[in-house]
Amino acid sequence: MQIPTDAVLLRIFIGENDRFENHPLYEAIVLKAREMHLGGATVLRGPMGFGHSSRLHTAKLLRLSEDLPFIVEIVDSEEKINQFLPVLDTMIGSGLVTIENIKVLQYGVKS
């Protein structure tokens, strides 16, 4: 599988406790992206953040927060990301979704 040099980065900002069909939402998103043969996906866990509610979520020891911020990043062509968006829309109830144009410098193992 190849990703074009001019590609798109899809970022999905959700909470650790968000669910889809009794599974963690971040896991369901990555598995669906894999099923749809998207170029790659990574889940990042944030130690601190806030969203539209302005409620602070933190991993500090003295203030154990549940529902830490998670970011799912998916990279592929604009066409394939656009095909994924309607599927994603059925999965997320709240969160922030962004798209950025990127340049892919390397994908996979160098020959």
Predicted regions and their residues:
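Positively charged, small/polar-rich N-terminal and surface patches that mediate targeting and assembly
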Residues: 1-111
